[in-house]
């Protein structure tokens, strides 16, 4: 719903300004908190999980029940803590990383070979391309992007 979209926008702003934001403690809809801390392979793992986990260590602190609010909302809340990790450089162009992750998850039922076809250079191959986006961890996405970038650069010099 609207709450999910609003909190997503806030988190994207935090990522953009991560050099200024060392730590965040916030209360959000439980569903969003679960999405943020999700691991590869889970149904809730997605764009927000990958982007935030690339730069922040996520801790799910506790659940807040509906009854503590007046009037009570229809959803549970959760308090989470984001602490910026030591990853300063992605090892690849940030724009490429965001593009690969977004494009991949926008067609999450397809393998990356099919979903990111427009991003990968001609003739490029990688074992990651045979997987669906939810099967890749943060380091896998970074490695894929570094490989794409290296391959693009080889093509540029020809």
Question: Where on the chain are the PLM-derived regions?
Answer:
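Class I S-adenosyl-L-methionine
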Residues: 6-135, 143, 153-158
